[in-house]
From Swiss-Prot:
Signal peptide: none annotated. Keywords: ATP-binding, Cadmium, Cell inner membrane, Cell membrane, Kinase, Membrane, Nucleotide-binding, Phosphoprotein, Transferase, Transmembrane, Transmembrane helix, Two-component regulatory system, Zinc. This is Sensor protein IrlS. PROSITE patterns: HAMP, HIS_KIN. Residues 188-241 form the HAMP domain. It is an enzyme of class 2 (transferase). The chain crosses the membrane at residues 14-34, 168-188. It is found in: Cell inner membrane. SUPFAM superfamilies: ATPase domain of HSP90 chaperone/DNA topoisomerase II/histidine kinase (SSF55874), HAMP domain-like (SSF158472), Homodimeric domain of signal transducing histidine kinase (SSF47384).
Length: 464
């Protein structure tokens, strides 16, 4: 509810919050000060009334008879000490007035005799007067007591409180107005680094993503935001570079088979040919069509796998048994290449069976393309407490260090100059990485050139 009432802009919102907090603080302070002053005035009036009442009791103790009370009017007036807000009256036990100062106003209803030794007090509703009454013993005579009533006129106190309240309200209103102006200026000053950051961000373009925003004279949260923004620009630049390379590689990989198809068709149509010759051209074109088809299927798979995590059919698999099954598919090709495939170790993985097969299949296919004749491809299954690791190793040429970080990128090839379009689509390892990300796992490669290259898949023990 409060968020909906606040302005939408950060500058206006900061200004409004500062004004509201200041107004609330001033209001609470004003109420507290007003209450303190009121309590102080009430305490002072109560003290003066009590002191006057005590003095009157002392002097009445020297009076022999109530008939002597009017004769000592000067003494009773002296007990007020010239206090203009105090008045008093003395009654006998029958309630007859024996003495009263000029400003005394009898309370309505009249104060009854105290039932205890505590003086009775009263403050009639709507009046500015307050009263304090008590019985005082006389020295002798009949009756032996008189009733003293002390009156306090709080008119001046009320006027002081009204003036104080008015002054406080005026000061607080002026303070809120001044605070509003200062808050707006503070918000403008505080957000100036943010405006400079926005102005520089507006100058950014796709060709300048590699240039981070210059360091601003900021600290704290704005410095963190500046670093986060520059980090985002770096990631965007890397994404644009990968996208540009992807587009370039895609165009190159599709151009080669299309160029071959076009050249074969043009040669076939350059002169009349026999049916067998046309058949040879068509059969030759099938390989290129199949390569294009595989490339399109791999690209569609990658596009679908980006949002496929929630659709995985996760179950516990015997990693070694499944690896034996996948390796069996490649036995004929391994025999032709004079390469053997060996599965070792035991492990259990939590994975989608079809995707596990595809990831392992891509790694075995990649190893077959690089393993020398007479060598062995080793599939190792290892179980740990927090993960299961499946690795595929071969003894081919290996991968130099600069290429290992990018080997799983789409269409990335270690040696583009030696790339043969018939050898694959260039998406196999990218598919492996996508499958592992969907399983919450990781993949990587360790290579010692001309000695051993190992691609590994690490599945977490509790995959989603």
């Amino acid at each position: 509810m409060i968020r909906r009432l606040l302005p939408r802009t950060l500058r206006a919102r900061l200004t409004a919050l500062i004004i509201l907090s200041t107004a609330a603080t001033l209001a609470l302070s004003g109420v507290a000060l007003y209450s303190a002053l009121h309590n102080r005035l009430v305490g002072m009036s109560s003290y003066e009334m009590s002191a006057t009442l005590a003095a009157m009791r002392t002097h009445l103790a020297n009076v022999a008879n109530v008939d002597d009370i009017p004769r000592k009017s000067d003494l009773w007036i002296d007990q007020l000490h010239g206090h203009q807000n105090l008045d008093l009256a003395i009654y006998d036990t029958d309630g007859r007035l024996r003495f009263a100062t000029r400003g005394f106003v009898a309370p309505r209803p009249a104060l009854g005799a105290p039932q205890t030794r505590v003086p009775a007090s009263a403050a009639p509703a709507g009046a500015t007067f307050s009263y304090l009454a008590d019985d005082a013993p006389l020295r002798g005579g009949n009756p032996r007591t008189a009733r003293i009533v002390v009156q306090y006129d709080g008119k001046n106190d009320h006027a002081l409180l009204r003036a104080y309240a008015y002054t406080v309200v005026v000061i607080e209103v002026l303070a809120v107005v001044l605070t509003a102006a200062l808050a707006y200026g503070i918000a403008m000053l505080g957000l100036s680094p943010l405006r400079r950051l926005v102005a520089r961000a507006e100058q950014m373009s796709s060709s300048r993503l590699a240039q981070p925003l210059p360091e601003l004279d900021t600290s704290g949260e704005l410095k963190e935001m500046e670093h986060a923004f520059n980090a985002m620009l770096k990631r965007l630049d890397e994404s644009f570079v990968r996208l540009s390379q992807f587009s370039s590689n895609l165009a190159h990989d599709m151009r080669t088979p299309l160029t071959n198809l076009l050249a074969e068709a043009q040669v076939a149509l350059s002169k009349p040919r026999t049916a067998d010759e046309y058949r040879d051209v068509i059969e030759s074109s099938i390989d290129e069509y199949q390569r294009l088809s595989r490339m399109i299927e791999d690209m569609l798979f990658l596009a679908r796998s980006d949002n496929a995590q929630s659709h995985l059919a996760i179950r516990t698999l015997d990693a070694a048994a499944q690896a034996e099954r996948v390796a069996g598919y490649y036995e004929p090709m391994a025999e032709d290449a004079e390469v053997s495939i060996v599965v070792r170790g035991k492990a259990e993985v939590r994975a989608d069976a079809l995707l596990y097969h595809r990831a392992l299949s891509n790694l075995i296919s990649n190893a077959l393309n690089h393993a020398p004749r007479g060598s062995t491809i080793t599939i190792e299954c290892a179980q740990a407490a927090d993960a299961a690791t499946i690795s595929v190793s071969d003894t081919g040429r290996g991968i130099e260090a600069p290429h290992r970080e990018r080997i799983f990128e789409r269409f990335y090839r270690v040696d583009p100059a030696r790339h043969n379009s018939a050898s694959g689509t260039g998406l196999g390892l990218a598919i492996v990485r996508s499958i592992m990300e969907n399983h919450g796992g990781t993949c990587g490669v360790d290579s010692e050139p001309h000695v051993r290259t190992t691609f590994w898949l690490k599945f977490p023990a509790h995959a989603a």
